[in-house]
Every structure is written in structure tokens, then in C-alpha cells.
């Protein structure tokens, strides 16, 4: 968005999340942090990085969210964004030479260019287990963890998964 504005383009962003940060707005489980050093997560925009100081080379989700909030405060990108908005259709009109975009809440937009930024983490995967419907406990997914946390102390907890989120949760759950 920042580069598009600098190029004189008018743009709009539709994002299913509540604010900037993508996966770092959804993944707020205990122990969630980057597994690559911060330069990979930092924008190469002097206005943003000149007033920002990381507390660690491997920040957690809270610091990343604060960074994205700082970025928005400096660049004022959210004025052209619609958060909590799911795009449900995008069709190219050959005659008009534009994209017709529709959202879940009924909004329509037209655009000469369409950039889809739905990465591998855009859709949660919850495997089906036999008798899962009979389980009487609570089930949480790491990418939809409540920000206020989950009181799991003193309870028997099963963590299913071998990726970064599973490993990070195991480290802080004992």
C-alpha cells in the first residue's frame, strides 16, 4: 500500500483480519514468536524503522502486533483498508478491462489490478478424528487462540501437530 501510494496509485485493501499483521494477528497462542531474525519481518521503510526498537531478535506475537500498529500509525495505511472483510468473488470483465470484486458483507468494487495475498496460513486445517464429536472437553486451534488466553493449568492437555506452533506451545505448557 505504501509503495502504491508513492507511485500515485489509488488502492484499497480487504482483509479478513482485525488489523495489520496477518498470521501474527491470528496466532496469539502461548509461546508464539518468530523463528527467523527480525530483519526478515522489518519493513525497509526509514519512516517506520527510525523510531522502532526491537527488544529481541526473535520477537513474540505481542511485539509483532505492536510493530504493525506502529507501522500503521506512521504510514496511516488503515485509512484505505477494510478489516474484518472477506472477499468472496473476483471476476475479470474482459470488455471493461477491470476486476469486479465482491465481499461477504455485500460490498462491490472495481479495480484495474487485483493482488491476491492469501498465503499458506490463510486457511486453518483441523483434522477429523474418530469420535471427535463425542469429546466433552474444549478444543482450540493455535491460529484461533483467544487473546485473553486459555486456562489450561492443572488440566490434561493434548497438543496435536509437529510444526512450529506445536513445538512452541509444548515449551510453555508444562
What residue spans do the PLM features occupy?
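Gly/Ala-rich phosphate-binding loop of Rossmann-like dinucleotide-binding domains
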Residues: 1, 5-6, 170, 174
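Glycine-rich, phosphate-binding/catalytic loops in enzymes
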Residues: 5-7, 29-30, 131-134
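Short beta-strand "acidic-cap" motif of Rossmann-like dinucleotide-binding folds
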Residues: 8-16, 24
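Conserved beta-strand scaffold positions in the cores of enzyme catalytic domains, especially
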Residues: 13, 81-82, 137-140
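Glycine-rich active-site loop/strand segments that organize a redox cofactor
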Residues: 18-21, 25-67
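Glycine-rich dinucleotide-binding loop and its adjacent helix/turn
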Residues: 48-54, 60-63, 118-173
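Feature captures the FAD/FMN-dependent oxidoreductase FAD-binding
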Residues: 55-121
Amino acid at each position: 500500500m505504501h509503495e502504491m501510494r508513492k507511485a500515485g496509485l489509488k488502492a484499497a485493501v480487504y482483509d479478513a483480519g482485525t488489523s495489520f499483521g496477518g498470521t501474527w494477528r491470528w496466532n496469539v497462542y502461548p509461546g508464539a514468536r518468530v523463528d527467523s531474525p527480525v530483519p526478515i519481518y522489518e519493513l525497509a521503510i526509514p519512516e517506520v524503522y527510525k523510531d522502532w526498537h526491537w527488544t529481541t531478535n526473535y520477537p513474540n506475537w505481542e511485539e509483532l502486533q505492536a510493530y504493525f500498529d506502529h507501522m500503521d500509525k506512521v504510514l496511516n495505511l488503515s485509512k484505505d483498508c477494510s478489516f474484518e472483510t472477506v472477499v468472496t468473488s473476483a471476476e475479470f470483465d474482459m470488455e471493461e478491462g477491470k476486476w469486479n470484486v465482491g465481499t461477504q458483507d455485500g460490498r462491490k468494487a472495481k479495480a484495474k489490478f487485483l493482488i491476491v495475498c492469501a498465503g499458506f496460513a490463510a486457511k486453518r486445517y483441523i483434522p477429523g478424528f474418530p469420535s471427535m464429536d463425542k469429546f466433552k472437553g474444549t478444543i482450540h486451534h493455535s491460529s484461533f487462540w483467544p487473546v485473553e488466553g486459555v486456562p489450561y493449568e492443572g488440566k490434561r492437555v493434548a497438543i496435536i501437530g509437529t510444526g512450529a506452533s506445536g513445538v512452541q506451545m509444548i515449551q510453555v505448557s508444562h
